[in-house]
Amino acid sequence: MKYNRELLFGRWFREDIDDQNRKVVEYAQLSADGSFEFTFVTIATQGGNVKTVLEQVTELGDWGLVADIHFTITKNEVVDEQLYTVDLNDSNNYHAYRVLQLNHHTFEYQHIDTNEIFKMRKVTDNIGYC
């Protein structure tokens, strides 16, 4: 299946619970020029409420979409407000995903190697009135 690349432009959001019962929130900005900014926030919770932010990492790099394959190349990371260049020889900075669903509201994709499935929701700046 072939997906329209323009559908990915903009801001996306997802949250999950990891295997250590921590909340992981991802904010993604995918730009038309092929650049991305992903921010991952790991949060300790207690009784469903935020207890403390454990980690916040921002990744910067390039992305693309060919047919039903979405790929990312991380080039920089921001940790504790410090910008670091990543090792481009490290295969962990390259990821490919099969797109399962993509429309104006939802982006669902599966990692090619790990088979993990992620589902993001589009963040809209415009609130419609009825």
Predicted regions and their residues:
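Lipid interaction determinants
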Residues: 1-66, 71-130
